[in-house]
Amino acid sequence: MEIFLQQNFVAIWHHFLSFEISRSKFALETWGSGNAYLIFQVIAWHHILVMTDHAESKIRDEAIDLWFQLSKTGFKTRSVLTYSLISSLTSLSIETVRRHVKKLEENNWVFYSKKEGVKFSPSHENNMFLADDFNVKEVRDLGRFLDVLEKRKQKKFN
């Protein structure tokens, strides 16, 4: 796929950037800043990684159900998401991470303790927003970008 992207760069890359800009704009409006969004994205990524250990299905609707279930009940994992790890993954200072995690906790997105680290723990309303608005838009827009790739590949082979 990398070679395909290199050979079709001009025809494809602006679609990728459009996807990224649209997603980032919506995320910045939601979380208030680039740093907050980047930190939240790492927290959601960690939650998805832990969730995959419990997932039996690959279907989005069933994954959303499991997402909601684990957000309410929590999950057993040895994987602890620390300020240090978030800092390492985002290149933000630990103090910046700490401040933003505190804001996310105040806004009912996460829970933090020294023992358990940062855990995705949204309010019902926040979870509904993620599942019914934010992720729906992400999936739709990513699908549209992948359609562009698929059409370009078909054009090349026809």
Regions found by a protein language model. Give the residues of each.
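Short gly/ser-rich anion-binding loops that grip negatively charged ligand groups
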Residues: 29, 72-76, 90
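Short helix->loop/beta-hairpin flanking segments within DNA-binding domains
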Residues: 38-79
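A short alpha-helical element within helix-turn-helix/winged-helix DNA-binding domains
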Residues: 78-90, 104
